[in-house]
């Protein structure tokens, strides 16, 4: 399954259109999104569940989006402390929700010593459980700043690279994205880059509408087939002009 067009991430589904499946679909269609990433797990635990009613908040949202022809990927923040348990919940959630793809969000915890073995164990088990599913890695935008992260172990087993190209405290998306792509083109293995741009506030900073347009335009100039934005929860609340 190829990924093309624009996509957005959902972190806490209740904070995106109140978790209403019909409203989420309408918002995605109005914005022209072709795909959506929903958070399915955090570490070894399922995410976006209502613990009081033991209800899966994602199931109706996923079904509604897929019915509308919008691809749905699950994303999973991983820590590496228990890679076998994290792999098990990844396979379980992805399978039970009938997702179109799976994204591994590996960040600071995976820059700690000894994480190469954890990454290899995790990826082997996830790939065994989901042998034909498209997968992506989502991590730092500048790999040379984070050499400790086991890039190869993750990239060996995924189909796409979705770096987090967040130009916080600045307004320079073009050079940031160009550097991201250049650095990943020099890494082995190379995977098609689908960058994620910021659609949130960090203190007093937030991306401008011009930033967002330049980001998308630069992606096209570089021949990238898709871009993503993080996240629906925060963008519609804090940066409505960006969403529009």
List each language-model region with its residue ranges.
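Structural preference for beta-strand elements that scaffold enzyme active sites
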Residues: 3-9, 34-37, 69-73, 100-103, ...
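Active-site groove signature of glycoside hydrolases
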Residues: 34-46, 89-118, 226-229
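Aromatic-lined substrate-binding rim segments of carbohydrate-active enzymes
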Residues: 38, 42-76, 113-137
